[in-house]
Amino acid sequence: MLINKYDFSFVGGDMRQVYMVNELLAIGYSVTSYGLENPILDNRCIAASSLKEAVISGKTIITPIPISKDGIHIQSSSSMDIKLDEFLNLLTLSHQVFGGCFLPSMTSYLMEKGISYEDFMEVEEIILYNSIATSEGTIAKAIISSTINLHDSHALILGFGRCARTLAHKLRSLCKEVDISARSRVQSAAAYTSSFGTIPFDKLEENISKYDFIFNTIPSLVMTKEILDRTKEQVVIIDIASAPGGVDFSYAKEIGRYAELYLGIPGKISPKSSATFLNHYLLEQIRKK
């Protein structure tokens, strides 16, 4: 039975959800949470004693992005063991669920039960806003991982999707040269019309040796052994594509190349900014309903 004591109920989450809670409380909403712990969490947020209490206490449920990393547990900043299937079984037709990167099995269940839901990471405007934190975090990671400046360097971005585009435009003001190599002819054309240098994907191996920084956004193996062999010894390779990424990491380590799969950046970098645009979209959707 839904009691609906609070405007919002947060289940699990990271720093983005902590800042979302604080902002919502600051503008007068009531909030309860379960599995969300941090010293800066506003003490007006009421901690639920159980998952069941959290779910039945609010019609609007906010979950993490991604909701789960292993498909079994809801991601949490606490040590609580929050089972995804237990959470789903507590939902009713009166609930509306927000979160990100919902599993196909979860969306199928919600649709079958007629429960309203919204996956933030299926919303174009949020994906674009998210690309800001992703690109800035990627640049920060590159800077602290390298022995040289971005200034006067040569950078290559593999792919030219949303995150790659934002990253490319930010790098342009920092690097001597930013080139794009994309498998898609449309993406290559988009890079060219944005005045970036373009490298044909089938010419990657013969051109790779000039780059100081390589950023991969393609979620399949593109940085093969053959290509890695031709990279500079001091190259920094940052892979922000979905796991397992697009780099042969074991071989990169074997030959002494720095390569790192760097994921979940908006949860690590500028979470307060991410929380602001998530709340903006959330409240807009609530008002519509």
Give the ranges of each region predicted by the language model:
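Residues in the short beta-alpha loop(s) of Rossmann-like NAD(P)-binding domains
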Residues: 14, 37, 103, 183-184, ...
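N-terminal glycine-/charge-rich "phosphate-binding" loop or analogous flexible N-terminal tail
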Residues: 4-46, 52-53
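NAD(P)-binding Rossmann-fold cofactor-contacting core
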Residues: 27-42, 174-194
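Rossmann-fold NAD(P)-binding glycine/threonine-rich loop
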Residues: 101-118, 241-285
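A short helix->loop->beta-strand "cap" motif at the edges of active sites that frequently abuts
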Residues: 29, 89-96, 113-115, 175, ...
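Rossmann-like adenosine-cofactor binding region
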Residues: 51, 66-73, 84-91, 191-266
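Glycine-rich adenosine-cofactor-binding loop
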Residues: 8-18, 24, 151-171
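Glycine/serine-rich phosphate-binding loop and adjoining beta1-alpha1 elements at the start
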Residues: 2-3, 62-152, 281
